[in-house]
């Protein structure tokens, strides 16, 4: 079985946050802490290697760990961060989570590791109803396919999944793990629930 110590995990904070009024979501505060800090608190007991993908405010993010930007400058969404993460991580297996999901499961990394098979390329979380494509674990061997995919201008992740050996990790017992805060209203509502 793949061990959590054999993985690296990247927090994806490279988006444009258009629904958050352009404010950098990872740095927006929830209960007096930046969202990214909530994610790190959940993730750091699970893995020794956490990296951050951010395309702006890199100095602010560097307080939390090693920061790198996308290689593709046209903001291809989370796929750009996944691509850059595969390039920067030192392990063969690289996991990804978004910066705006403060309730990540405390066993997320372990569940992904347990689901890895010898021929796995990509593992994607599934909440019982939907796949959660930014909660994922990639093997570095996917990098050439992902590079070609992005160079072609493709952005639909489902097409990449069809090119690779993709499987799904069951999180149907904990759908709240995937709550992400995309708007000021969602942030305010979630903050009231947490208080």
Swiss-Prot record:
A Pfam family matched by this chain, by name?
NTP_transf_3
Q: Where is the signal peptide?
A: none
Q: Which UniProt keywords apply?
A: Cytoplasm, GTP-binding, Magnesium, Metal-binding, Molybdenum cofactor biosynthesis, Nucleotide-binding, Transferase
Q: Which cofactor does it need?
A: Mg(2+)
Q: Cystine bridges: which residues? A: none
Entry's InterPro entries?
Answer: MobA-like_NTP_Trfase, Molybde_CF_guanTrfase, Nucleotide-diphossugar_trans
- Give the residues the record marks as binding Mg(2+): 100
- The answer to whether UniProt assigns keyword Ribonucleoprotein to this entry is no
Q: Which GO terms describe its biological process?
A: bis(molybdopterin guanine dinucleotide)molybdenum biosynthetic process
GO CC annotation: what is one? cytoplasm
Q: What does this protein do?
A: Transfers a GMP moiety from GTP to Mo-molybdopterin (Mo-MPT) cofactor (Moco or molybdenum cofactor) to form Mo-molybdopterin guanine dinucleotide (Mo-MGD) cofactor.
Q: How does it assemble?
A: Monomer.
Record remark on domains: The N-terminal domain determines nucleotide recognition and specific binding, while the C-terminal domain determines the specific binding to the target protein.
Instruction: Tell me the protein's name.
Output: Molybdenum cofactor guanylyltransferase
Q: Which gene encodes it?
A: mobA
């Amino acid at each position: 079985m793949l061990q959590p110590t054999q993985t690296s995990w990247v927090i994806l904070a490279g988006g444009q946050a258009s629904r958050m009024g352009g404010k950098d979501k990872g740095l927006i505060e929830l209960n007096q802490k930046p969202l990214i800090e909530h994610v790190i608190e959940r993730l750091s007991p699970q893995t020794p290697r956490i990296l951050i993908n951010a395309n702006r405010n890199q100095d602010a993010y560097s307080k939390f760990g090693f920061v790198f930007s996308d290689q593709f400058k046209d903001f291809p969404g989370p796929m750009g961060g996944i691509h850059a993460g595969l390039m920067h991580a030192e392990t063969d297996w690289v996991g990804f989570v978004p910066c705006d999901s403060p309730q990540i499961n405390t066993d997320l990394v372990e569940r992904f590791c347990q689901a890895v098979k010898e021929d796995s390329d990509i593992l994607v979380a599934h909440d019982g109803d939907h796949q959660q494509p930014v909660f994922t674990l990639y093997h570095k061997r996917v990098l050439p396919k992902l590079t070609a995919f992005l160079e072609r201008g493709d952005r639909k992740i489902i097409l990449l999944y069809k090119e690779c050996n993709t499987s799904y990790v069951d999180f149907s017992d904990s759908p709240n793990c995937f709550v992400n805060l995309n708007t000021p209203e969602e942030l305010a509502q979630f903050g009231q629930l947490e208080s």
